[in-house]
Structures are given as C-alpha cells and as structure tokens.
From Swiss-Prot:
Keywords: Ribonucleoprotein, Ribosomal protein, RNA-binding, rRNA-binding, tRNA-binding. One of its GO terms (cellular component) is cytosolic large ribosomal subunit. One of its GO terms (biological process) is translation. HAMAP family: Ribosomal_uL16. Residues 1-17 have a biased composition (Basic residues). GO terms for molecular function: rRNA binding; structural constituent of ribosome; tRNA binding. It comes from Bacteroides thetaiotaomicron (strain ATCC 29148 / DSM 2079 / JCM 5827 / CCUG 10774 / NCTC 10582 / VPI-5482 / E50). This is Large ribosomal subunit protein uL16. Residues 1-22 are annotated as: Disordered. The gene is rplP.
Amino acid sequence: MLQPKKTKFRRQQKGRAKGNAQRGNQLAFGSFGIKALETKWITGRQIEAARIAVTRYMQRQGQIWIRIFPDKPITRKPADVRMGKGKGAPEGFVAPVTPGRIIIEAEGVSYEIAKEALRLAAQKLPITTKFVVRRDYDIQNQNA
C-alpha cells in the first residue's frame, strides 16, 4: 500500500480541496492518461487496485506512471466512543484530487489497449474520469 516513509506530523486537519488542479493537469510522461473530473480523496488501496488492473490488461507491455501519491494522513476514532477526548488514531493516507488532475499515464501500447486498460483502472477509482490522449499523438500511424 502506498504511504510516505516518514511524516513531519502524525495528524493533519481535513481541509478542503477547492477549484481545479493547477499542477499535474497535463500529460507529462505517456501518450495516454486518465484525468479526474471531480474532487475526491483517493486512498492508497484504490490507487494500487487501479495499477494492478492496468498492468494485468496490458500484460506487462508498455509503461505506466502513477501521478498521484497518498500523503495526507486520515484519522479515525473507534466505534462506540463518545465525542471529544482528542483526535483519533491515524488510520491511513489519501491523495486529495481536484478536477483536471492526471491520475495515471500509459505509453508503449496501442490506442485501443491503452483506452481499455485505463477504463478498467477508472472503474477502481471513486471518481468520474476522462480518457485523454497527447495532442501530438497520431492514431492512424501508431507503431505500438
């Protein structure tokens, strides 16, 4: 499961992700990708499930890049505990995602394989996504 090796503080305030993604909103490594269309927290387990779905469908061909990392700690109090008495214990980590953020990129496979692999990955995520292709990618003359 994805999580930071070390954090400065064990707990963090919830905060609110507002607006669209200002960085990480364009394809940087691959020719294909999935872009978030809504704001949500994505856990490390969800990212890992999406990664496994992509690699299984692509049969270890090509290359993928995970563009988000869960570095925000989430706390939870046990069941049947009254309000107060401090913040709960750290439970896991999430990656806050805003609209426009590229989540996964792929390269080295055909357009059809990449589209289906990233569709399977998008089903594992709790947000609506959009399949994006690099502007200078030529679908007619693909050599994958």
